[in-house]
Structures are given as C-alpha cells and as structure tokens.
C-alpha cells in the first residue's frame, strides 16, 4: 500500500492540476536528504532531478534500511506512476480536492497488475484506453464504481460462471512490490456485472469454493470483490483492512465499505467488518475472528455437504 503522493506531484494549470510522475533519481535524492521536521509533508525539490515525494513517505520505498517498500528504481515504478498520471489527468482535480486525492492509500500490486493487463495484447485493456482509465480510477478510489471482471486487476482465471470470475493472484512474479513468501497463494473473485446475481449462480460459486478451496476463508476488503485467503493470513488482512478504513475516514475519503453477500463471506469476517463499520476498536473487532460462531442454516436447498474425500481439494494444505 502507498499514497498517491508517492508516485506523482501536482502542477497547477489554469484552474486545475496536471499530475507529473516522479523519476527514480529525484526519489533517491530525497531519501538521502536531511529535511526539517516542519517540511516533512512538503514535496521535496531535488534541484537536479526535479520534484520528489514528501520525506514523510520515505518508508514507502525500498532502501538498505527498509526492505518492505517499493522497488522504485525498476521500470515498473515508472510505468505505474505514468498510468496513475494518465488517469488523474483525464479528470478535473481542483485546489480544494488535490490534497485529498494525493493522500489516498492505494494497492501498489493492484496497479502493477493493471500495467500488466495493459501490456497484454490479448487483453481488452490493451485495446480500450477508456476502459483502462476507468479501471485505474476504480483502483485508486476515485470512482464509486466497483471493480468488475472487465476492470479487475487481473491474474490467472481459475473459475468462471455467468456471474463471477475467480482469479489466482500473481504477486510472486511482481517487480515493484513482490510477495517474498514462496508459499503465498491467494485468489480474488469479481462480479462480471454490477447487478443482482441469481441464486443459482451464487450456489455454483459456493459449491466451487466449498469443494475446491475448503482450506481458505472468503473475505472482502470492502471494495465490491471477494478475496479467498488462507486462514493463517486472515489476521494480517484484518490489520490492513482496519488501518485503511481508519485512514480513509481520517482523510475524508468516505468510501462505502461493501460487506457483500453474507452467504458467500466467511461468518467471522462478516462479523469483524460489521463491528469495524460500527466504530469499534481493532482489538474488539479482531476478537470476532477467533470466536466460535453459531453455524448458519444452509441458505440453499440442495447444496449437499456430502462429498467423497477424493473430490475435495487439497489446495492450501
């Protein structure tokens, strides 16, 4: 995750702003600079290489002292920054909005995946600039539309029916912020269209999840899509979701947190996110993740719980 101010800076033109991507040498200069405390939140002028991000975001970049940040010296950083600028320059951002826009926390990996989709000649985003920009505006939280299959970050499709598409995420192969844990495995489920889904299509998805992904929890980050994650990583997801929710509220980015379909979401996660929306503390909310929940009655008649062992997936064991 990183703020949009880590990728670009605003330049006032007439009554709105044009956004310009940072170059890696300007960032490198900022990372070595001594800056007064009172100037930590201001864009840094490297003199030689142009404007750099505010020093308060130093931890967002990979350095000798911080290996968890972005690999900003890779070509992928520039591609992501340029893509963000293209999207922001396609809309009008006024002086009253610019600070709020640049403070938005976005998924770096999501944006890298959109770059990969853009570069794939077989992908619809390669052929449609309009759909590409729409996908980016959704990814950076500017659009109120949800991420559907056409505008999704992408990955490897492992399941699809008339209503849903399930993707295996390819973060292990990323350049900007790769997942380093080689045991990482995670999926995302997007709706093919933002409209009501028939019960039969929900039933098909639940059956697929129950038999092929029985070692995973279905959760949501509140953005209109589902994530299918290992139970061992649920607490980590909870920390991130809670932090992003609080940050967005603090900065005035009051995007609606979408709880999604309770029949699909893991019961404990639904309880966690509901509690978070009510304004409870992280500790209070997280307790619900480890609490034994009363088992819901089967919402679908005919969805059997009987299955032969050789038909049950061992993925995630």
UniProtKB/Swiss-Prot annotation:
**Record protein name field:** Non-structural protein 2
Q: Which GO molecular-function terms appear in the entry?
A: ATP binding; metal ion binding; nucleoside diphosphate kinase activity; ribonucleoside triphosphate phosphatase activity; RNA binding
Query: Which cofactors does the annotated protein need, by name?
Result: Mg(2+)
Question: Do you know which InterPro entries this protein is assigned to?
Answer: Rota_NS35_C (IPR048306), Rota_NS35_N (IPR048573), Rotavirus_NSP2 (IPR003668), Rotavirus_NSP2_C (IPR024076), Rotavirus_NSP2_N (IPR024068)
Q: What is its EC number?
A: 3.6.4.-
Q: What are the protein's UniProt keywords?
A: ATP-binding, Host cytoplasm, Hydrolase, Magnesium, Metal-binding, Nucleotide-binding, RNA-binding
Q: Could you say which protein family the record assigns here? A: Belongs to the rotavirus NSP2 family.
Question: What assembly does the database describe for this protein?
Answer: Homooctamer. Interacts with VP1; this interaction is weak. Interacts with NSP5; this interaction leads to up-regulation of NSP5 phosphorylation and formation of viral factories. Interacts with host DCP1A, DCP1B, DDX6, EDC4 and EIF2S1/eIF2-alpha; these interactions are probably part of the sequestration of some host SGs and PBs proteins in viral factories.
Positions bound to ATP: 107-109, 188, 221-223, 227
**Sequence segments annotated as region (RNA-binding):** 205-241
Major localisation: host cell
Q: Where in the cell is it found?
A: Host cytoplasm
For biological process, the GO terms are:
viral genome replication
Q: Which Gene Ontology cellular component terms are annotated?
A: host cell cytoplasm
* Active-site residues annotated for this sequence: 225
Q: Tell me, what does this protein do in biology? A: Participates in replication and packaging of the viral genome. Plays a crucial role, together with NSP5, in the formation of virus factories (viroplasms), which are large inclusions in the host cytoplasm where replication intermediates are assembled and viral RNA replication takes place. Displays ssRNA binding, NTPase, RNA triphosphatase (RTPase) and ATP-independent helix-unwinding activities. The unwinding activity may prepare and organize plus-strand RNAs for packaging and replication by removing interfering secondary structures.
